[in-house]
Amino acid sequence: MPIRVLDELPAVNFLREENVFVMTTSRATGQEIRPLKVIILNLMPKKIETENQFLRLLSNSPLQVDIQLLRIDARESRNTPAEHLNNFYCNFEDICDQNFDGLIVTGAPLGLVEFNDVAYWPQIRQVLEWAKDHVTSTLFVCWAVQAALNILYGIPKQTRTDKLSGVYEHHILHPYALLTRGFDDTFLAPHSRYADFPAALIRDYTDLEILAETEGGDAYLFASKDKRIAFVTGHPEYDAHTLAGEYFRDVEAGLNPDIPYNYFPKNDPQNKPRATWRSHGNLLFTNWLNYYVYQITPYDLRHMNPTLD
């Protein structure tokens, strides 16, 4: 789907350089197609980088996707210019009376922070409650998975002793599930988290179906049977260099991090890493858009919630 974004968004030129199909609003208005409305709650500090990563994955099928960017943290950002946030992001109050086909909630570097200590925890709870009536399907990524499991299922925060960082092998459990359609039997995906997601915990305390696991027994991809919510505990959206950037940042901060697993060639941080998960990430997001959003969302979004005009 060509993604539809504001003409001035920096990601337009960035993605066009990669030959990614981006449709500006001015061009999209000439097509008589209802675009899918997808809103991204971007919780990552480097918002422009995260926009580029997710928009790349949402751009690869034949229908339009109308992207809205959402922020819920009113504090001044140290990593993203205020002008960018003011020009391209909306606040929850701007969209709370609207319906959307899809919602993506990104990860956040909050693995060691207790939920109630997160500055915008009440706002996250508000958005998740709102999504039940206003969004066809929601996809949670990494830390957002942990937050959603707590809010929606009451599962306490599970934290690893050491950070899981690297590119890990996974295997699918349901090869004919729609979300894993076309996946290889085993595939690679990056992880960068303190959050812990034991598959047994998901099975014992939720009605969610686990679709793929890590070789270590962590749940990687799981979803509700009605397709309204889906969870991915890794970072399939990451660029080839993202884990390297995190590693060198932590080295400079004196944190003595482990070298990301299965990432740098010959396990040498001086070697340029390669993205070995790109096809998996594209297929995952295409499947979510097609089977969890497009195939079940109403043509008229007003029908999602009859109380709306």
From Swiss-Prot:
The record marks G111 as: Important for acyl-CoA specificity. It catalyses: L-homoserine + succinyl-CoA = O-succinyl-L-homoserine + CoA. Its main location: cytoplasm. Pathway: Amino-acid biosynthesis; L-methionine biosynthesis via de novo pathway; O-succinyl-L-homoserine from L-homoserine: step 1/1. CDD domains: GATase1_HTS. It comes from the Bacteria. It is found in: Cytoplasm. Pfam families: HTS. The record marks S192 as: Important for substrate specificity. GO terms for biological process: L-methionine biosynthetic process from homoserine via O-succinyl-L-homoserine and cystathionine. The active site is at C142, H235, E237. GO terms for molecular function: homoserine O-acetyltransferase activity; homoserine O-succinyltransferase activity. Keywords: Acyltransferase, Amino-acid biosynthesis, Cytoplasm, Methionine biosynthesis, Transferase. InterPro entries: Class_I_gatase-like, HST_MetA, MetA_family. Substrate binds at K163, S192, R249. Its EC number is 2.3.1.46. One of its GO terms (cellular component) is cytoplasm. Homodimer. Transfers a succinyl group from succinyl-CoA to L-homoserine, forming succinyl-L-homoserine. Belongs to the MetA family. NCBIfam families: metA. This is Homoserine O-succinyltransferase. The lineage of its organism: Bacteria, Pseudomonadati, Pseudomonadota, Gammaproteobacteria, Enterobacterales. The gene is metAS.
